[in-house]
């Protein structure tokens, strides 16, 4: 709208009347782009480098599931503050090739007691990481004091290995569950 008004202001006991004129805006609104559901979201790599750098072919693939090796790289880069120098850390898992691009990241997080493998001694770097595993890695990387299990989510039981990690992150509003009260600890 437009018009004129007077604003009465009192400063240090002195009252002033200040005339204010509101004019019709001539600014052109900036249109909000519409995104088709079939289009992949655009990731601004300026804000994600060096933590998430995409694939060798230049793609980012934000809708893909994250592998255990990829998460190790992201968390290690965040923790270290930059990319790790080659040869500084080496993963000890028999299924992580010494020349694999993610080897040094897994080795770094192993060294910092952030990552562990499976009971059979493997790491399975190409497996999709689960929500429970991500919760454990984040809680360990942040060195959070874990809260005890109290049944926040209906599908996280007292027997789930990641229960305290999940509930700690939920308590800190870092993770959340689904509308039906579940968390999906074994889902990607």
Please describe what each predicted stretch is.
Residues 1-30:
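Extracytoplasmic soluble-region selector
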Residues 25-69, 75-104, 111-132, 140-164, ...:
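Feature responds to low-complexity, polar/acidic, surface-exposed segments characteristic
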């Amino acid at each position: 709208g437009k018009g004129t008004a007077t604003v009465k202001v009192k400063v240090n006991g002195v009252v002033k009347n200040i005339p204010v004129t509101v004019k019709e805006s001539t600014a052109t609104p900036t249109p909000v782009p519409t995104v088709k559901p079939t289009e992949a979201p655009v990731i601004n790599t300026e804000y994600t480098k060096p933590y998430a750098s995409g694939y060798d072919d230049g793609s980012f693939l934000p809708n893909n599931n994250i592998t255990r090796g990829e998460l190790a790289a992201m968390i290690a880069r965040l923790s270290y503050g930059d990319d790790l120098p080659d040869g500084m850390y080496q993963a000890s898992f028999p299924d992580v090739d010494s020349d694999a691009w993610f080897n040094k990241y897994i080795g770094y997080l192993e060294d910092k007691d952030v990552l562990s493998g499976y009971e059979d001694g493997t790491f399975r770097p190409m497996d999709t990481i689960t929500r429970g595993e991500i919760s454990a890695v984040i809680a360990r990387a942040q060195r959070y004091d874990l809260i005890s299990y109290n049944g926040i989510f209906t599908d996280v039981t007292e027997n789930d290995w990641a229960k305290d990690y999940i509930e700690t992150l939920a308590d800190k509003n870092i993770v959340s569950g689904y509308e039906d009260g579940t968390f999906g600890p074994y889902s990607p």
